[in-house]
Amino acid sequence: KAVDIPFVFWHQNKYYMLYTGFDGKGYQSALATSDDLLHWEHKGVILKRNLDSDRWDRIGGAATWMIKENDDFNQIPKLGQVDGKYWLVYHSYPSTGYESGPAEIGLAWTEDEDLLDWHFPDKPCFSWKDGADWEAGGLYKACIIRNNDIWYMFYNAKDKEERWTEQTGVATSKDLLHWERYEGNPVMKVNRESWDERFVSDPYIVKDGN
């Protein structure tokens, strides 16, 4: 029914695309490869649904980001390893359906150079339950960059209003596992009666020069 959230990077002398699919029940995420950025070959589903499980992410997940070698605007994105592992960011909803219920964020890792065999956390690393009212409706896309040995995770979230708004916040970590929200969140806010009055979302952060 839908293909969403493409994230393109260079790995093993090929272009890879991390992307999410929706089948009416929930999100699952996959990889495709290409030599020319125009013709893509499906490689495999890496984040699957597991309804027989009692895991927090059993409905499946929307993978949004993989940690890169660097975050330079002027370079092709290449995967980077942290402690010998590749890292993937995803969010998962608690119920079947389209974005059904408040999502939470997890980080998966792999040592597999083919990027097909992933280890998923037993619990989310970042939850709306620990946040403020502006994110009480759940979390969405996140991206992670490193600056001065500190990890920064930018994420968008929504409130619980019927006509909800989505805004972008940031959290920091020293180990990718334990995150602390910035007290000044949200760092990107909606502007009433403007083009961005409801959504300021889907962050993608790069560094340009100094």
Predicted regions and their residues:
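Carbohydrate-active catalytic/glycan-binding domains of CAZyme proteins
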Residues: 1-210
